[in-house]
């Protein structure tokens, strides 16, 4: 009996790892070429927060293995600080998918949005709800993420 419980526990442990795999393998880069007023540490924190938001969230009900995750990159260029914690930026998103039965990837989506305004307070969690609009930052990231997943 104890052996069966141990085997059942191990089986559940190993299958749970597969179910936790998320859909994206996102790389986030934030540039601030013309910005001189804001503290540069804020943007490093923002970069890490966005990467965590994109890579750890379960966007669909589908189960993806690690090698099946969609490679994508978000290049965010902060162009100006409009007010405290309010920024104007541009974003370039590119998503790649593996070509079936080959060893290379192909670009599926490549888009640039030149006018994006959002608010970000350092160390404040990025909150998102599918049924409610909570912020310009997470709303825009989720919008482009769903496009990348849907293609």
Regions picked out by a protein language model, each given a short descriptive name:
Residues 22-88, 99-101:
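Start-of-domain marker
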Residues 88-151:
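Acidic/His-rich structured neighborhood in mature extracellular/periplasmic domains
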Residues 1-24:
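Bacterial Sec-dependent N-terminal signal peptides
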């Amino acid at each position: 009996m104890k052996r069966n419980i141990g085997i059942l526990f191990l089986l559940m442990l190993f299958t749970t790892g597969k179910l936790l795999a998320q859909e994206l393998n996102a790389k986030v880069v934030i540039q601030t070429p013309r910005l001189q007023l804001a503290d540069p540490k804020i943007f490093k924190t923002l970069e890490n927060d966005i990467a965590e938001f994109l890579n750890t969230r379960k966007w669909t009900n589908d189960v993806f293995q690690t090698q099946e995750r969609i490679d994508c990159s978000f290049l965010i260029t902060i162009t100006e600080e409009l007010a405290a914690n309010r920024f104007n930026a541009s974003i370039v998103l590119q998503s790649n998918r593996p070509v079936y039965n080959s060893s290379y990837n192909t670009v599926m989506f490549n888009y640039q949005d030149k006018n994006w305004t959002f608010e970000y307070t350092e160390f404040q969690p990025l909150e998102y709800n599918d049924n409610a609009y909570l912020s310009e930052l997470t709303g825009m990231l989720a919008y482009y993420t769903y496009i990348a997943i849907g293609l």
